[in-house]
Design a protein with these regions (language model features):
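Mixed-charge, Lys/Arg-enriched low-complexity segments
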Residues: 2-7, 44-87
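Short N-terminal "domain-start" leader segments
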Residues: 1-40
């Protein structure tokens, strides 16, 4: 996933934006907690949104955060395919 730096001027953290399998991904660094977290949105009729902080998931490195984001999206898509087959 390619990330674009969208950090605002004078911000104490870092903010990046990217896309993965039609999901909009935001990878953020919090200087207060010295950790990375992500939030995603599907921007389509599925209206899927998720923030890793809801489950208290924080990452030590940006790479780990990106990997966690991609794994979450892959899991959502896999579950959607299974439910389509059953329904």
């Amino acid at each position: 996933m390619r990330l674009k730096d969208v950090t605002k001027r004078f911000s104490s953290g870092k903010f990046y934006k990217g896309k993965y399998k039609k999901f909009e991904c935001h990878i953020n660094y919090s200087s207060y907690s010295d950790s990375w977290y992500y939030h995603i949105s599907s921007n389509d009729k599925r209206d899927i949104r998720y923030n890793s902080l809801w489950d208290e998931l924080k990452f030590k490195t940006q790479e780990d955060c990106i990997e966690g984001c991609q794994k979450y999206i892959d899991g959502v898509l896999k579950n959607a395919k299974i439910s389509k087959k059953m329904g």
